[in-house]
């Protein structure tokens, strides 16, 4: 996402980058203050891939809609949910997102394939021109094994999500406790509570 934003800047778009606090959380007030009448898209990563901090996506969505309404405009909301699949609820209606991206290998699917949820009614143009595949939304011969593998993998990950969260969070918490108690000066990086179940990041 970062490199895509940098590429958009080179094309003439104005991009605003927001800071996070020491736990990796983005402030709702910072988001609100950054939105202007020219804002067309907000993109927030759901789970930080390094420190595991979980952002409050549903609350951010409500904020964006409220501010957009006050400006009498519409703002699209995208979340990069790559690190969240298999551990967090990705119900797009509950989250209130317009766009959500996933990568199959993060939930034990095949490498080299991902998916993008686009809310019905949102117009978009393909990145590549060519054949009429996928109703002219993506040119080129479809990677059928990859697509089927992604679909099956996310179904399996979702069916085992609750069990995986309990198992991984227990192991995570035991490891954090052991590190803190055993190695003096150990510092947990990321949010202590709003943290994905399969992440431990510490500094010594």
Residue ranges and their predicted role:
Residues 1-204:
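Pyridoxal 5′-phosphate
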